[in-house]
Amino acid sequence: MSKFFKYITYILFTLCILTACKKEDEGKNPVSDSVRISAFALKADSTNIENLDKVFFTIDLEKGLIYNADSLPRGTNVTELKFTLKTENASEINITTADTTYNYLKNDNLPNNLFTPANIEVVSQSGSYKKNYQLKINVHNLNPDQLYWGGVQY
């Protein structure tokens, strides 16, 4: 029994030494293939409406949609809203409006009229993958504090 225990100890010791001496790949940085937008938020702007930075946005990764489920108040001027978005090491974030494309990572001063339905294209760090997102900011069409009886026939 002591010989068996001795051999098992040698084998375990040898395995520990061999695995501890395994050389790791040095100089290689892993490249991300993620095209996920992990966060989207409006920047605070008290001249437009209060608490803009607290508006919750839904990011639907399967359908490629970014939208606010709870609409902004009627009369909100969406052409003056600024935003931030976060990705996981994207190499490019291209935002396309009606006629122009902007690189979000290279251009800090995006135009004010960005929020016509905009398309956001995220390119992975490796450049192998692309994902398109549709940005839609919902605003109330009617004043929720008033009753509308137009179009009702008796």
Regions found by a protein language model. Name each.
Residues 1-9:
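Bacterial N-terminal signal peptides that target proteins for export
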Residues 22-154:
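Predominantly extracytoplasmic/ectodomain segments of secreted and cell-surface proteins
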